[in-house]
Regions:
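Solenoid-like repeat scaffolds
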Residues: 188-192, 224-232, 266-277, 312-323, ...
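Residue at a conserved register position within TPR or TPR-like alpha-solenoid repeats
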Residues: 337, 395, 429, 466-467, ...
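Conserved redox-active cysteine motifs that mediate thiol-disulfide chemistry
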Residues: 88-104
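Thiol-based oxidoreductase modules, predominantly thioredoxin-like and allied folds used
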Residues: 61-67, 88-89, 106-128, 140
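Bacterial signal peptide processing site
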Residues: 29-33
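Generic helix N-cap/helix-start motif at coil->alpha-helix transitions
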Residues: 193-199, 233-243, 274-288, 319-351, ...
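Non-catalytic, surface beta->alpha helical segment in thiol-disulfide oxidoreductase systems
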Residues: 138-179
Length: 559
């Protein structure tokens, strides 16, 4: 479980504390006759929280955690000649809660759900991680649209504005071919694409692609090629593809950005309507875009920072956006204010954090005001899980560590997944060099975590923290690892997807801890304790091999 929190819209890299992002559907590219009519922007209204994550009123969800349930859903889809919409999420994850608070309760989405078979896969249901492997999904949330025959059509962007999400969903439902085929034609025969084809590419969830459509290393260059090939009469769709390319660029080898591209970006930022339509890109990836499009301390960077600052302040004040979206705009302002700060080095036991540049007093005051307001005003449980975790991250990022801790502690009793907030408290303590406090919160977060896959993920984080911050506490490390083996033994999908990565991370961490045989006896005991986990009757031969190699070789998940 990664304790770095970035934008909530980055579902594929989701870990601790994430903030929400939103986007409006961009202007059409290509043949205008193909484009559905756009709805006017409306404020996102949270739904009342329910006790079961998959009982949102009005949507006829089919719960699925095994192949037979998935097969039954596709059989029903074939009989009704409807596509299949698969939602993959978890109770604790902030963007999942944001989707529940602002999308699944909307009447337009509920009505649209009558046109597909909605399948709900809770990552903590027994066997769900095998389903994740079947569909090649990992990050929460991931939403995928399939044909009735089981062919993947597109992956939907969970970070976009709910109104536009429903429009993008409609694009997918009306698509005559999968996005992979559309991409191939776009690169080989761009003139053959219609408006909806270009929009399908622009709004495809590349963050959760899992290399199903394109290799991750080729993504930035491919997105740039798409932006260049997009028809000239659709600048906003082309701009969205270009923003995605800049956001995905390798920071060590950024693409060459010409004067015209920077000018187009500045023009976008200066246009209130057009910039709102790109909200998710501008708020989630502000720092990445600025770094990719300008050199440090250059006049071009100064211009971009000024344009971004104006646009982000405008988005923060836009009450037609959800609280999570506006909070993300404020997070982006802090990110840009710290864009030239040195990267945070991994914390060493007892080490004090590096000094950070002081933020403008007005920005600090705004951070305090907006986070306090969110805490006062939010009553919806889903929205609180999404926004308060983001607010706590924002406070820490702004240098207000004590405020961040106070907010998290005050919300432990209000959260349906307090262990998530505890992990943020642990991360805060680790960053300020308080190893004892960090370990206390990591341990409590693990103890309070719920759900088989979640417990393996949180347990993996606790063990990593022990190895990093208390490497000589052999008994605690051995006890925690032994407990994780015991819990994994009862899970049929322990070596798949997120669970498999969690166990693999533990194996890698313990092998590093034992470098040079420093903890040979403890490792031998842990290897013995692994036997019941590896030898469970339900394990395949590849799973057994993966299990047996956890402490002796490169740890890999079985699939």
């Amino acid at each position: 479980m990664n304790t770095d929190r970035r934008g909530m819209g980055r579902a594929g890299g989701f870990a601790l504390a994430a903030a929400a992002a939103a986007a409006l559907l961009v202007a059409a590219c290509g043949k205008p006759a193909d484009a559905p009519k756009a709805a006017a922007p409306t404020p996102a209204t949270p739904a009342p929280a329910t006790t079961a994550a998959h009982t949102e009123g009005g949507i006829d969800w089919k719960d699925a955690s095994n192949d037979s349930q998935i097969d039954a859903a596709f059989a029903a889809a074939r009989e009704a000649n409807k596509p299949v919409f698969v939602y993959w999420g978890a109770k604790w994850c902030p963007p999942c809660n944001q989707v529940k608070a602002t999308l699944f309760n909307r009447q337009d989405f509920i009505e649209r759900s009558r046109g597909f078979v909605p399948v709900y896969v809770d990552g903590d249901s027994p066997g769900a991680q095998k389903i994740g492997a079947r569909f090649h999904v990992s990050g929460y949330p991931t939403m995928v649209l399939f044909t009735p025959q089981g062919q993947e059509v597109t992956r939907l962007p969970g970070e976009v504005d709910p109104v536009r999400y429903t429009q993008v969903l409609t694009l997918g439902m009306n698509a005559s071919r999968p996005v992979a085929a559309v991409l191939a034609d776009a690169l080989a025969r761009p003139a053959s694409l219609g408006t909806n084809d270009w929009r399908l590419l622009a709004f495809y969830s590349w963050d959760t692609d899992q290399q199903q459509v394109i290799d991750k290393k080729r993504l930035p260059a491919t997105l740039l090629a798409l932006a260049d090939a997009c028809p000239a009469d659709a600048p906003d769709t082309a701009m969205r593809l270009r923003l995605k390319a800049l956001a995905a660029a390798d920071a060590k080898a950024p693409p060459k950005v010409d004067t015209a591209t920077r000018a187009a970006l500045v023009a976008l930022l200066g246009d209130s309507a057009r910039s709102r339509e790109q909200t998710d890109m501008l708020t989630n990836y502000a720092a990445e875009i600025v770094r990719a499009a300008s050199a440090k301390s250059s006049p071009e960077r100064t211009t971009l920072l000024g344009a971004f600052d104006t646009a982000l302040k405008r988005l923060e004040a836009d009450t037609t956006l959800s609280r999570a979206d506006r909070m993300q705009a404020l997070i982006a302002q802090v990110d840009l204010a710290r864009i030239d700060d040195p990267e945070e080095a991994p914390a060493r036991p007892g080490a004090k954090p590096a000094a950070r540049a002081a933020l403008p007093a007005a920005l600090v005051a705004d951070v305090r005001e907006q986070t306090s307001r969110a805490d006062r005003e939010i009553t919806n449980g889903y929205e609180r899980q999404a926004v308060i975790t983001a607010a706590a991250y924002l406070l820490e990022r702004a240098g207000l560590d004590a405020d961040s801790d106070a907010l998290l502690k005050a919300n432990l009793a209000k959260s349906h997944s307090p262990y998530y907030l505890m992990s943020e408290l642990a991360s805060n303590a680790k960053k300020r060099g308080d190893s004892a406090e960090a370990l206390r919160w990591y341990r409590e977060a693990f103890e309070k975590s719920e759900g088989p896959a979640t417990r393996l993920q949180w347990g993996s984080s606790y063990i990593a923290a022990l190895v990093d911050l208390a490497p000589n506490d052999e008994s605690a490390i051995e006890a925690a690892a032994g407990q994780l083996w015991s819990e994994a033994e009862k899970q049929p999908d322990a070596f798949y997807q997120r669970s498999g990565r969690a166990l693999g991370n533990v194996g890698t961490k313990l092998q590093a801890w034992n470098k040079g045989g420093a903890h040979r006896a403890a490792m031998k005991r842990l290897q013995t304790q692994l036997h019941p986990l590896c030898a469970a009757p339900a394990r395949s031969s590849s799973e057994r091999a993966t299990c047996e190699a956890l402490l002796t070789g490169p740890a890999k998940q079985s699939t």
